[in-house]
């Protein structure tokens, strides 16, 4: 009995051959749109393209598209918004694509813009540092995000699968919701930060936050260094948490399930750190009144009697604290 695979191949072979002969199969195309109308906001809706927003060399706005003829593409201005849309072509042969990857490149004059909205199904997103937006909302299914622009208001990034990298001069409230992937934030100023990840690592270096930092991670490691904020709340379930030079002016809370909590030159007015299985090992910048608890493990903390409360607990693990 012939396999199902061989039967499908025999059925599709003449179809593909006919499509190629008639020029109906999906090949590549290149389009360029010059945008002469003025606009403030930018909205991009793509199905299977990488998206790049880059500064133009001539001060003009152009949109370049390289992709499959199986896709329809258009760029126009409507009600003060530059709308860029990629949709599937209505063709019986649109599923026959020989283009490996599609790409949308938006060349913008450097300067300030209103809202930036990007909705992508499959593809990477890169936004250069030469722009300032009032707000940014990125929603991706599969693809990496590299965001370097300044945002005066809120920035929201939702993704199912992919890595997220940010290096911004300034951002308002930053919210990241990611199912699978890593988050990296470097040299940024934010009014608040909220990160929620199911599986992946978090790495933050050089963050100044006016308000609260909240990080929730199910599986993965959290590493933070040179971070200042008002309140910090870090919750992990499986994986170590490493903090270096992280200072909260108010509350400093860390909760872990399985994994060590390690910190150096950190501080907060009030500190609460707990882990179920793992050590708590750290160095603080100021005296604290310590309360400690471990079921299985050793405890060694300074015998100071001034400062805020430092509550440390682990079920299985050691507690070792020094004061710098």
Residue ranges of each PLM-predicted region?
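Short N-terminal helix-initiation segments at or just after the protein's N-terminus
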Residues: 262-264
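Acidic (Asp/Glu) and glycine-rich low-complexity loops/linkers
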Residues: 2-12, 16-120, 124-140, 144-159, ...
């Amino acid at each position: 009995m012939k396999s199902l695979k061989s039967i499908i191949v025999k059925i599709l072979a003449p179809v593909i051959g006919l499509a190629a002969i008639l020029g109906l199969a999906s090949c590549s195309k290149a389009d360029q749109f010059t945008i002469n109308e003025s606009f403030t906001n930018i909205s991009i809706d793509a199905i299977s393209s990488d998206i790049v927003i880059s500064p133009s060399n001539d001060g003009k706005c152009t949109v370049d598209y390289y992709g499959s003829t199986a896709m329809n593409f258009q760029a126009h201005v409507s009600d003060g918004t530059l709308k860029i849309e990629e949709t599937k072509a209505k063709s019986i042969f649109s599923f026959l694509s020989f283009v490996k990857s599609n790409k949308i490149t938006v060349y913008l004059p450097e300067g300030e813009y209103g809202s930036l909205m990007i909705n992508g199904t499959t593809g990477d997103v890169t936004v250069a540092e030469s722009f300032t937006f009032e707000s940014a909302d990125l929603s991706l299914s599969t693809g990496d995000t590299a965001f370097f622009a300044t945002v005066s208001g809120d920035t929201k990034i939702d993704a199912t699968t992919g890595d997220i990298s940010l290096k911004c001069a300034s951002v308002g409230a930053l919210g990241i919701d990611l199912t699978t992937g890593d988050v990296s934030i470097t040299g940024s100023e934010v009014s608040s930060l909220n990160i929620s990840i199911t599986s992946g690592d978090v790495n933050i270096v050089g963050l100044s936050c006016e308000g609260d930092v909240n990080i929730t991670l199910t599986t993965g490691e959290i590493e933070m260094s040179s971070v200042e904020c008002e309140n910090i709340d870090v919750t992990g379930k499986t994986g170590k948490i490493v903090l270096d030079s992280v200072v909260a002016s108010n509350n400093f809370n860390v909760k872990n399930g399985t994994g060590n909590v390690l910190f150096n030159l950190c501080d907060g007015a009030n500190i609460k750190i707990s882990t179920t299985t793992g050590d708590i090992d750290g160095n603080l910048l100021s005296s604290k009144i310590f309360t400690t608890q471990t079921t299985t493990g050793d405890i060694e903390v300074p015998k100071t009697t001034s400062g805020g409360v430092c509550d440390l607990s682990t079920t299985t693990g050691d507690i070792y604290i020094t004061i710098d």
